[in-house]
Design a protein with these regions (language model features):
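Short, solvent-exposed loop/turn and secondary-structure capping segments
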Residues: 71, 96-102, 160-164, 205-209, ...
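Short acidic alpha-helical/loop segments enriched in Asp/Glu that coordinate divalent cations
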Residues: 165-167, 199-214, 253-255, 280-282
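Surface-exposed patches in mature extracellular/periplasmic domains of secreted proteins
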Residues: 66-75, 136-141, 161-165, 253-256, ...
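Extracytoplasmic electron-transfer domains, predominantly the class I c-type cytochrome c fold
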Residues: 50-54, 59-67, 87-89, 94-138, ...
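Post-cleavage N-terminal segment of exported redox proteins
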Residues: 2-67, 110-182, 304, 309-328
Length: 328
């Protein structure tokens, strides 16, 4: 049911990488303007620049085979799990509302509330590496980083600087007035998600003896999944991604899960055990800029960790708005 990864920070561009940011997804009710079409990689020349873009595509679609924890060259073991970036950035980052990577070249550098400073596109890639991929940062001057950035830049072909293209993020469905229910979500998971991701959430390996072959269907929790600092570990990101993309192959124009089912199954999945990221208390140094569904403290609003995890989020946002008004 789920090809995974996400979290957005401040603007729609931050809704981009594998499993790590937080912020603003586009509202599906907004006009689909400006339009965008996928650049064709086959039209690229086989020169060094074209080959670097192709290398970036390979890294997105088969991350585990190039920089995963089981690759032969230990110096290349940057990722800490055997996922692929395209588990979350569907169709190699080209699917509308499948957390696409298009149009991002002109949106960086940008301010990140999570980091509390301006970040580059390379910083954003490394946020995914350390959160969604549960690994370590790529050197900025490494071949792999240059290839990632070259592919993202290629997907921005034709986009104007500062232009937010239609389809970024994972969509935006109405939130529940109640808390999402992980108990009900468990039943939804068993019925809808387990056929692909297994009842224990551990996914399906291509070869159980060769982890660097990756997964047919990725794990949604457990030691080889994204960590608790990733964007997919937050309910709003996960539930919207599921509603508009899952089971795999679903189009955002014809969701197969109801909104209620998506919220509840999201609550179930994010409640499951996964790797722990250190120093999460340092995220969002401005506590009033912390999104309502970040499932780890500290918080400035007085609400419980449980409500930040499952909602409802409206009362949290209202409290934050009051605190901001008082501060100003």
């Amino acid at each position: 049911m789920l090809r995974i990864f996400l979290r957005t920070q401040s603007v729609a561009a931050a809704l981009i990488f594998l499993f790590a940011c937080h912020g603003q997804a586009q509202d599906l009710r907004s006009p689909a303007d400006p339009a965008w079409s996928v650049p064709q990689m086959g039209a690229l020349p086989y020169d060094p620049a074209g080959m670097l873009v192709r290398r970036g595509h390979d890294l997105i679609t088969a991350t585990y085979a190039h920089i995963g924890p089981a690759v032969a060259d230990e110096a290349k073991r940057y990722a800490g799990n055997n996922l692929a970036c395209s588990n979350c950035h569907l169709n190699a980052g080209t699917k509308k509302f499948g957390i696409p990577l298009w149009g991002l070249k002109g949106l960086f550098p940008q301010y990140s509330f999570e980091a509390g400073k301006e970040i580059s596109i390379e910083d954003r890639v490394n946020s995914c590496m350390t959160r969604s991929m549960n690994g370590k940062p790529l050197p900025v001057d490494s071949e792999e980083m240059k290839a990632f950035v070259a592919f993202i830049d290629f997907l921005s072909t034709g986009a104007k600087r500062g232009e937010t293209l239609s389809g970024l993020g994972a969509g935006k469905m109405p939130e529940l007035k109640r808390a999402a229910d992980p108990v009900r979500g468990k039943a939804v998971y068993a019925r809808t998600c387990a056929p692909c991701h297994q009842l224990d959430g551990q996914g399906v390996l291509r070869d159980r003896h060769l982890l660097n072959f990756g997964y047919v269907n990725p794990p949604l929790w457990g030691p080889d999944s994204f960590n608790d600092g990733a964007g997919m570990a937050t309910l709003i990101a996960f539930a919207n991604f599921v509603h508009f993309n899952m089971p795999n192959g679903t189009s955002y124009t014809h969701p197969r899960l109801t909104q209620q089912d998506a919220w509840d199954v999201g609550a179930y999945v994010i409640s499951q055990p996964r790797p722990k990221r250190a120093d999460l208390d340092k995220d969002f140094p401005d506590r009033l800029a912390k999104p309502a569904d970040i499932p780890y403290g500290p918080y400035a609003d007085g609400f419980s960790q449980k409500q930040h995890m499952y909602g409802p989020f409206g009362p949290i946002r209202a409290a934050i708005a009051r605190l901001k008004a008082k501060k100003n």
